[in-house]
């Protein structure tokens, strides 16, 4: 195992980050396909989760991706977007498409130096922080994975069919053919 400093200094490649971002949206699209089957009432039903409903949880993930993408571009948002801004899954998907395209474009434009670049930003509470670009992109993907698991549980609570497998290895297998 690498010690903490060695691990922190070891960079992913631009290709590694591209694969992770591609996986992130592959899994998100699979999840949204399952969410499409929900009724409008199910989409917003309070399930007493971290974020009350399927809509609120997915909106939170989209919002977080938008915030991190903004920070990667040197802009630090000072507030979150409202969780109730999407009426249905179609509106959520449309709103997410721009952020998805932005993150893909950002990662596609990275070279080795860009991957290692230290990004300085402010948290929503106003405190400052700085992290390498590849750490932030990894965080976006990991955050999405965490909440996709929550939404999968919510779908089961609602009696809806869970999504197709969302595992990273399933993504690699599918890409391999």
Give the predicted meaning of each segment.
Residues 1-2:
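Leucine-biased recognition of intrinsically disordered, low-complexity hydrophobic segments
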Residues 18-82, 123-177:
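Short, contiguous alpha-helical
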Residues 75-116:
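Helix-adjacent hinge/juxtasegments
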Residues 112-118, 161-165:
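A short coil-to-beta-strand element that immediately follows conserved catalytic motifs
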